[in-house]
Regions:
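Phosphate-binding beta-alpha-beta segment of Rossmann-like dinucleotide-binding domains, i.e.
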Residues: 88, 95-144, 156-159, 163, ...
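Glycine-rich Rossmann-fold phosphate-binding loop(s) that bind the pyrophosphate
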Residues: 150-151
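An N-terminal-biased, well-structured beta-alpha scaffold segment characteristic
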Residues: 1-93, 212-217
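Rossmann-like adenosine-cofactor binding region
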Residues: 56-58, 173-265
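Active-site regions of enzymes building and remodeling cell-envelope glycoconjugates
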Residues: 21-28, 89-90, 179-187, 269-273
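Short, Asp-centered acidic motifs that coordinate Mg2+ and/or phosphate
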Residues: 46-47, 69, 196, 224, ...
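C-terminal helix-to-coil terminal segments
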Residues: 2, 86, 93-105, 259-310
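Short beta->alpha connector loops at strand-helix junctions that form conserved
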Residues: 28-29, 73-74, 90-101, 172, ...
Length: 310
């Protein structure tokens, strides 16, 4: 008999079918379906597949006495109650490294689109406007890029920035060994120095509103911020206020605090480029995350352990 798996996130039919080759899948991607599935099948669930945004609460873990493994499909796991899981002997794993390149590509795409004003240039062109009537947008090559969170995704972003001859700085809790990029102990100092910030730090309570009014205004009226991390890291109200007041040049956001609803206060701002939390999604990267989940699950069930533990 196949182990019972509770799937809490939306996935394509092909991906669900691939997982269903190995597990009895209970697919519950909405809140109502989730609550009903745990109430009805909680006694049987051995594995949960979720993601960082959707998470898994301590109460839900307690309602599944046979639960052995909680997996986040991507790298983020900020809303999984890891302490509650460990207290009950539940292993926790994620998909670290599976979509780093895709996220970094998207981050740089947002940077280029925002700084160069590509979406608004596209709209103007479709409306018959020629270049002589359009204000010039700044370039990217040779500028100073500050990366907030130089983890595996941050390193991929830095590699792409090097191809644009950018000066690269980063802010972490501590310097990263073996890295020659300029380290900033204080984020404010990096914002003062940088032309652009790309936010690639984990979400959660420790980084909530890390990029606030002070940081945005330090970046300045010619500065731009890109967020491909978690919406909670950037103070949306402060971001809107800074752009409207001319204290920040613009922003490219794949994530925002109002998800899945778009950030209402930013929708009329042409200096803002928005995408629907899709930076890590491509056919290749999604397949890699599913493959990693299956690796983790097989390792756990075989007694050899997960490949990418949290």
């Amino acid at each position: 008999m196949q182990p019972t798996l509770l799937l809490l996130i939306a996935m394509t039919p092909d991906n669900v079918a691939q997982i269903a080759e190995h597990f009895h899948v209970i697919h519950a991607p909405t809140r109502a379906e989730r609550d009903a599935a745990i109430a009805r099948h909680g006694q049987d669930v051995r594995i949960v597949l979720t993601n960082g945004s959707t998470g898994l609460t301590g109460a839900e873990i307690a309602a599944m006495p046979k639960l052995e493994l909680a997996c986040a499909l991507g790298a983020g796991y900020e809303n999984i109650d890891v302490e509650a899981a460990r207290a009950r002997g539940v292993a926790v794993a994620n998909g670290a490294g599976t979509n780093d390149a895709c996220v970094a590509d998207h981050a740089f795409g947002l940077l280029l689109a925002t700084v160069r004003g590509i979406p608004k240039l596209d709209r103007s062109t479709r409306n018959g406007v020629w270049r002589d009537d359009i204000p010039l947008q700044p370039g990217v090559c040779g500028k100073r890029l500050g990366i907030v969170g130089l983890g595996t995704i941050g390193m991929q972003i830095a590699r792409r920035a090097a191809g644009f001859d950018m000066q690269i700085g980063y802010h972490n809790r501590k310097p990263r060994e073996g890295v020659s990029y300029r380290y900033f102990d204080a984020l404010k100092d990096m914002a003062d120095w940088a032309d652009f910030l790309i936010v690639a730090t984990p979400g959660g309570a420790q980084t909530k509103h890390l990029v606030d009014q002070t940081i945005l205004e330090a970046l300045g009226p010619n500065g731009y911020v890109v967020n491909i991390a978690r919406g909670s890291v950037v103070d949306t109200a402060a971001l809107e206020a800074a752009i409207r007041a001319g204290k920040l040049g613009g922003a490219g956001l794949d994530v925002y605090e109002s998800e899945p609803k778009p950030p209402a206060g930013l929708l009329d701002l042409e200096q803002v480029v928005l995408t629907p939390h899709i930076a890590g999604w491509s056919p290749e990267s999604v397949q890699a995350t599913v493959d990693r989940f299956l690796e983790n699950a097989r390792g756990h069930l075989a007694g050899t352990g997960v490949v990418s533990p949290v």
